[in-house]
């Protein structure tokens, strides 16, 4: 009994395994795990991370393409279809009563208006039209950028031209069919004032052009504005007279254009054709007008004005014109006034007169009388101020100071002598500048005489009794290059004149007159102060020596530019040091002086 351990059941070991069978293969853990994971439904869930897209993306792309093509076809049919009939049905295009068969070209895609999807869409093949249809402008560009590009294109086109004015005149004539010169008269100076101005501007922003119609109303009594082919035309009748510079600055600030894009001249006031252009143009629908017609347009368009009597010549009008333009010579007056005949009725009447030469001589004499009276009425300070106002531009006053110091002259001493010289102080009103040749004596004195509009006397005319006559018509005079015979003559006959006393001066066709010599500049190669023979002139002269040669640059231009602008800056800078009076103190209660008038007409008429 003790030998039989456990229990033995016969027959049970045949259907029940009491022990597991061991093998070497089952000892591999990886193999065991793989075997445990196997099942009949193992492919039900895929654990693969890389999935293929399939045809869904391609399908979406095809749908988007179809929608885009449909939208494009609708836009083509709406905007670039050559005939409105095709918008209804292409089948109507094939119906024709004539035998004229035109070539066809397929323009649209397969999808059409929906009448017949299988019908081929055709349109006329006009070569020029198809070329224009193919060029569809981009829709994404904004209107503002287009305006800027258009303005820049106009300006760049203008800048590429060699002659800007000729280009603008050509564009104006092409736009309006009439020359700009035929509508306007020419003003040479930019500072000449006029109430009426004709302005042509090329390449203006349209929005700014529209706003200018309202902004200009506060400046003008009458406005005439139109636009054609990028050229904008203005007729402006200002409430107050303006010069060209003022008008251009106003329009540049208002329209944001460059001065090179503007043509500005006053209109022709006596031309019937010009007046009819403005009158008929005002009835155009594209023309904007504000205010009543100016007087000169009404006069030119009235029938009574055309049938009136011929105008008679008015001498005072001619004299006033010559005085305003500072013309005193007969030849200049005759030539310049004859050029005004197409625009000025009085000039036309003068040309038709038999006594043209007599009128010219009398006009020149009257202008000289008026100019001489105007000069005598002014003091030296007023005369210098009056002449400096006529000098345009600015210069450097230091150029004159450097030149004086270059010649070794104490500037304070020279300034003191110049002050006594300009004031005509007795025995101090004659300034002598001497030195070797080519030292700049004549250049220095001539530049001063030029800016002050003085007179030059020459000893070569000393045999004549009238060689000193120009001194009676000037505020300052110059005797250039005095030699020994000249010094002897002055020592013999001109001592009283250099003293600043009254002398008797013989003038042509006149009795001798009583005058005082104006301040006299003398240049010479002889130092009269060192000559004992001229000892009586020593107390009557103030002398300065120019010992150094006048310097020149490598390009043969002067080192010191003695210009009108330099003298203008010199006098303005040293006005108080020269003891010149203030112009406000010379007026009556500070009131502005009125312009001189010598014409028998009302003040509000046009010149």
UniProtKB/Swiss-Prot annotation:
Catalytic activity: Couples ATP hydrolysis with the unwinding of duplex DNA by translocating in the 3'-5' direction; ATP + H2O = ADP + phosphate + H(+)
Pfam families: PPV_E1_C, PPV_E1_DBD, PPV_E1_N
DNA-binding region: annotated span: 147-310
Record SUPFAM superfamilies: Origin of replication-binding domain, RBD-like (SSF55464), P-loop containing nucleoside triphosphate hydrolases (SSF52540)
Domain SF3 helicase: 409-559
Residues bound to ATP: 435-442
A GO molecular function held by the record: DNA helicase activity
One GO BP: DNA replication
Assigned keywords, A-Z: ATP-binding, DNA replication, DNA-binding, Early protein, Helicase, Host nucleus, Hydrolase, Isomerase, Nucleotide-binding, Phosphoprotein
PTM: Phosphorylated.
Gene3D superfamilies reported for this sequence: 3.40.1310.10, P-loop containing nucleotide triphosphate hydrolases, Zinc finger, large T-antigen D1 domain
GO CC terms of this entry: host cell nucleus
Enzyme class at the top of the EC tree: isomerase
Residues the record lists as Phosphoserine modifications: 81, 89
InterPro entries found in the cross-reference section: Helicase_SF3_DNA-vir, P-loop_NTPase, PPV_DNA_helicase_E1_C, PPV_DNA_helicase_E1_N, PPV_E1_DBD, PPV_E1_DBD_sf, Rep_E1_papillomaV, Znf_lg_T-Ag_D1_dom_sf
Chain location of the short sequence motif Nuclear export signal per the record: 88-97
Extent of Acidic residues compositional bias: 582-591
EC number: 5.6.2.4
Region Disordered, annotated ranges: 582-607
Family to which the UniProt record says this protein belongs: Belongs to the papillomaviridae E1 protein family.
Function of the molecule: ATP-dependent DNA 3'-5' helicase required for initiation of viral DNA replication. It forms a complex with the viral E2 protein. The E1-E2 complex binds to the replication origin which contains binding sites for both proteins. During the initial step, a dimer of E1 interacts with a dimer of protein E2 leading to a complex that binds the viral origin of replication with high specificity. Then, a second dimer of E1 displaces the E2 dimer in an ATP-dependent manner to form the E1 tetramer.
Complex and partners: Can form hexamers. Interacts with E2 protein; this interaction increases E1 DNA binding specificity. Interacts with host DNA polymerase subunit POLA2. Interacts with host single stranded DNA-binding protein RPA1. Interacts with host TOP1; this interaction stimulates the enzymatic activity of TOP1.
Record protein name field: Replication protein E1
Native species: Human papillomavirus 24
The encoding gene: E1
């Amino acid at each position: 009994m003790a030998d039989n351990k456990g229990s033995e059941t016969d027959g049970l070991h045949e259907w029940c395994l009491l022990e597991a069978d061991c093998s070497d293969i089952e000892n591999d853990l990886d193999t065991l795990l793989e075997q445990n994971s196997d099942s009949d439904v193992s492919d039900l869930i895929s654990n693969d991370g890389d999935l293929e897209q399939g045809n869904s993306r391609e399908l979406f792309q095809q749908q988007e393409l179809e929608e885009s093509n449909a939208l494009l076809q609708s836009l083509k049919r709406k905007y670039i279809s050559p005939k409105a009939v095709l918008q209804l049905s292409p089948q109507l295009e094939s119906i024709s009563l004539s035998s004229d068969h035109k070539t066809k070209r397929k323009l649209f895609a397969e999808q059409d208006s929906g009448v017949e999807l299988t019908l081929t869409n055709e349109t006329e093949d006009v070569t020029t039209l198809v070329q224009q249809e193919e060029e569809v402008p981009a829709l994404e560009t904004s209107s503002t950028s287009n305006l800027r590009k258009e303005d820049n294109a106009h300006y760049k086109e203008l800048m590429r031209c060699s002659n800007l004015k000729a280009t603008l005149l050509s564009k104006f004539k092409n736009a309006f069919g009439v020359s700009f010169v035929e509508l306007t008269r020419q003003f040479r100076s930019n500072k000449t004032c006029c109430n009426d101005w004709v302005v042509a501007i090329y390449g203006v922003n349209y929005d700014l052009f529209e706003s200018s119609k309202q902004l200009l109303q506060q400046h003008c009594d009458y406005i005439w504005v139109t636009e054609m082919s990028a050229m904008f035309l203005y007729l402006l009748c200002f409430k107050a007279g303006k010069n060209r510079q003022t008008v251009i600055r106003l329009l540049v600030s208002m329209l944001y254009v460059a001065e090179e894009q503007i043509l500005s001249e006053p209109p022709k006031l006596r031309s019937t054709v010009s007046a009819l252009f403005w009158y008929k143009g005002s009835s155009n629908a594209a023309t904007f007008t504000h205010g009543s017609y100016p007087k000169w347009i009404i006069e030119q368009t009235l029938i009574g004005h055309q049938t009136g009597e011929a105008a008679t010549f008015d001498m005072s009008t001619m004299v006033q014109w010559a005085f305003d333009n500072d013309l005193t010579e007969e030849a200049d007056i005759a030539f310049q006034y004859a050029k005004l005949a197409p625009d000025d009725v009085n000039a036309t009447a003068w040309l038709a007169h038999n006594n043209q030469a007599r009128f010219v001589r009398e006009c020149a004499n009257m202008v000289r009388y008026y100019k001489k009276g105007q000069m005598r009425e002014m003091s030296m300070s007023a005369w210098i101020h009056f002449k400096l106002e006529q000098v345009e531009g600015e210069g450097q006053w230091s150029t004159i100071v450097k030149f004086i110091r270059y010649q070794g002259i104490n500037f304070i001493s020279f300034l003191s002598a110049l002050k006594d010289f300009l004031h005509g102080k007795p025995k101090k009103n004659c300034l002598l500048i001497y030195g070797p040749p080519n030292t700049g004596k004549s250049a220095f004195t001539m530049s001063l005489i030029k800016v002050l509009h003085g007179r030059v006397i020459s000893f070569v005319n000393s045999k004549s009794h009238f060689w000193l006559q120009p001194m009676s018509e000037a505020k300052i005079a110059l005797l250039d290059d005095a030699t020994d015979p000249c010094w002897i003559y002055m020592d013999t006959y001109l001592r009283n004149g250099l003293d600043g006393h009254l002398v008797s001066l013989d003038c042509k066709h006149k009795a001798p007159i009583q005058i005082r010599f104006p301040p006299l500049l003398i240049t010479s190669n002889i130092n009269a102060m060192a000559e004992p023979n001229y000892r009586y002139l020593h107390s009557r002269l103030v002398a300065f020596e120019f010992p150094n040669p006048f310097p020149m640059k490598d390009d043969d231009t002067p080192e010191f530019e003695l210009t009108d602008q330099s003298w203008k800056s010199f006098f303005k800078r040293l006005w108080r040091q020269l003891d010149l009076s203030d112009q406000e103190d010379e007026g009556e209660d500070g009131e502005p002086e009125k312009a001189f008038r010598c014409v028998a007409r009302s003040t509000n008429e046009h010149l």
